[in-house]
């Protein structure tokens, strides 16, 4: 997962750039709502692209590209919120190996 570390570092560096010259700086400058709007947009694009993976199109490359876009914007969000990607990876690592329903029950508190 070296790419995650490298991407995180690059995003942090670009936050300091001129928003007129850096897409990351522009998103950061426009604030949380703009970043969330982009994540929503990218999520929708993933859903639509995934529908294209079924016959007859079978376009897996498109959905893969859209997922990369979504991950990128999630990385921008993490940086904006001052959350390290490693924190997310640790949570995933802790969940690995447990059945999904068992793991979910552990983190779902009754109301």
Task: Indicate where each model-derived feature is located.
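Flexible "arm" and connector segments at domain edges
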Residues: 1-67, 71-111
């Amino acid at each position: 997962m070296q790419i995650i570390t490298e991407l995180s570092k690059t995003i942090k560096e670009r936050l300091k750039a001129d928003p007129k010259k850096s897409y990351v700086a522009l998103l950061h400058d426009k604030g949380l709502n703009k970043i969330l709007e982009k994540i929503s947009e990218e999520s929708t694009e993933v859903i639509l692209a995934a529908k294209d993976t079924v016959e007859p199109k079978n376009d897996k490359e498109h959905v893969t590209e859209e997922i990369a876009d979504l991950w990128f914007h999630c990385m921008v969000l993490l940086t904006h919120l001052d959350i390290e990607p490693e924190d997310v990876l640790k949570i995933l690592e802790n969940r690995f190996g447990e059945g999904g329903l068992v793991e979910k029950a552990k983190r779902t508190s009754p109301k």
